[in-house]
Amino acid sequence: DELFGALDINGLQDRFPRELSGGQQQRVAIARAMVKNPKLLLCDELTGALDTKSSLGVLQAVQTLNDRYHTTVVIITHNAAISGMADRIIQIKDGKIQSNEVNANKVSPMELVL
């Protein structure tokens, strides 16, 4: 229930996938991955199809998963603002690591400017 609330998907359990918007489908897919409490969660364009409110909810849920269950979360994104919540930022260009740095100015998802 906490995960459903964080991802704003309460009430979607009884609906068919074709009845959900793209953003709702993405949030449900994220919940399906997170409910298993994985040791590693790979997220490619995690917030790509989401509005700002939903994006913040998803990022907060991922942060909670990381904090509570010590899940390693790898977020692949073109949204530089999201990197603000990372412990480590790795930039890749043309398949090669350009930089690999500890984020000394980490912020919470709610402090991000998306």
What does each model-found stretch correspond to?
Residues 1-11:
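Conserved ABC ATPase "signature" region
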Residues 16-20, 24:
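Conserved ABC ATPase signature
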Residues 30, 58:
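Hydrophobic anchor residue at the start of the ABC signature
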Residues 37:
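Conserved catalytic motifs of ABC-family nucleotide-binding domains
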Residues 41-44:
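Catalytic Walker B motif of ABC-type/P-loop ATPase nucleotide-binding domains
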Residues 52-54:
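Helix N-cap at the start of a conserved alpha-helix in ABC-type nucleotide-binding domains
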Residues 61-74:
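Conserved catalytic loops of ABC-family nucleotide-binding domains
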